Amino acid sequence: MAHDEQWFTPRLQTAATLCNQTPAATESPLWLGVDLGTCDVVSMVVDRDGQPVAVCLDWADVVRDGIVWDFFGAVTIVRRHLDTLEQQFGLRFSHAATSFPPGTDPRISINVLESAGLEVSHVLDEPTAVADLLQLDNAGVVDIGGGTTGIAIVKKGKVTYSADEATGGHHISLTLAGNRRISLEEAEQYKRGHGDEIWPAVKPVYEKMADIVARHIEGQGITDLWLAGGSCMQPGVAELFRKQFPALQVHLPQHSLFMTPLAIASSGREKAEGLYAK
């Protein structure tokens, strides 16, 4: 099912409002999606209408360049999210959808969820998850995460090309740490609350990302470019990409941090309809 901006914009707002808060009341069947990111782990629950009803988020350094390097830490976070959600809803989540960066082994994400006590109902790469949610035509999807940037080309709702580049929010933090002479951990915290202030220092990194995207989408004949991922929430990113790609319609939804988790949870709802919390 195709979803336009009127469909997902309020859902992203709802996800942001519910993040680590009391879940929304619902009697609907519920589906769980787990996004294992470089800087965060997000578990999102959606109802039959694809509306987020609960969101758990932990900032965590458990994934680097698309690889789970702290397996125990990742499992611990997912298990904690699962325990929280099951206690809040009084239901058992036996299945969840998840994703992986293009070009990496999906078994990495699957193993984390299985070790946390979940069966994986559906798995797909990150930009494909967003592309499936939007059901685009002649468009590119750029998912700028913490450690990687996923790029997908979509024609008539089908992903015809995907790639992953080892650049993302982690590299922004490295640049900021060097610029301000602070630790990487301090830089991670600082960038979340000082977006306008840090833009001059980190803009060159985003310019490099845009150059990388340009190489991947060259000659693909797309008309629209959709940006997703938490690293896109930096003020200045949308304007930079619009200047880099003046011939394209560049879209950046608010609260893009939750776009991939919403896409993952929605894929579980649409592709594994009978596997919901009971």
Task: Please describe what each predicted stretch is.
Residues M1-T38, V42, D47-V141, K158-E165, ...:
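Nucleotide/phosphate-binding catalytic cleft detector across ATP-hydrolyzing
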